[in-house]
Amino acid sequence: MFCRTVTMAAAAALATPSAAFAWGQTGHRVIGEIAQENISGKTLAEIELILGEEDLAEASTWADEERSNPDNFWQREAGPYHYVTVPEGQTYAEVGAPEEGDALSALARFTQIVRNPNASRQDKALALKFIVHIVGDVHQPLHAGNGDDRGGNDVKVRWFGDETNLHAVWDSRLIDSRSLFYTEYARWLIREIEPSDAIAWWTADPQVWVAESTQIRDTIYPTADQSNPNLGYAYQYEHLGTAEMRLKQGGIRLAAYLDQVFASN
C-alpha cells in the first residue's frame, strides 16, 4: 500500500512544478556522479535493471522535485525523510527517530523495498531514488539539525549582500559559487579523492555520516554577536572546502551503501 501511494503520487506530480532543492541540484548530482564512478560492476548492473538508462546523478534530485506535489504523502509523510534531528551534545543513537520518521528510518524502509524480491520494478525504482537522495541529504551538515532553528532555515544571513538563510547557503550558495556544471564539478572532485581517502571514507553506516554532520554543523554558524550577518569571501574561504569534502564523502558513501544493498542479490 505504501509503495502504491508513492507511485500514484509520483504520477500525479508530472504536471507539478519542482520545489526547492536540498544540497541544491548541483550538489545532489555531484554526489550521484561520484557514486556512479565508484560502485561495483555488480551494483551497476542491478541499478540498470531497476532504473534503466537513468543514472544516479539524474535519480538523485527526484525526491526534491516531488516535494511540491499536493498529494498527502509528499506534503505530510515524506517531509521528515530529508533530515534528522540531533540536539547539540547528543548522538543519533541516543535520540533515535521520532514517531513521524526521519531520514535514517526512511533509508532503512526504502532499503527493505529494494531488497525485496517480490517488489515491483516501479516500487524498487522509487525506493532506490529515495536512497540516493537521502544519503546525499545527511551529508549536508544542516540536514542533521539541532532542533532549534529548522536546520538553519531560521538563521537569517546575507550572502554577498543578498538576503537568505544559513540553510540555503549550505544547500547551494557555497557550491554554486564555483559556477561549474555538475559533471565538471564531479570530475574535478573525483580527481581530488586520494585512494587513501576513498578507503577511509568507505563506510555504509548512516550513523557515522550523521555524527560527522552534527560535528561540522556546530562549527558553521555565524558568531552569536552578529545579527543578520553578511557572509562573503571570508566565510566562503573558511567553509567551501568542508562543503566539497562532504560532497566527496557523500559520493563515496553512496557507492559503499549501494554495494552493500545489492551484495546479497
Predicted segment positions?
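N-terminal signal peptide c-region/cleavage motif recognized by signal peptidases
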Residues: 15-19
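N-terminal, motif-rich segments that launch catalysis or mediate targeting to/interaction with membranes
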Residues: 21-134, 141-265
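Bacterial N-terminal signal peptides that target proteins for export
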Residues: 1-7
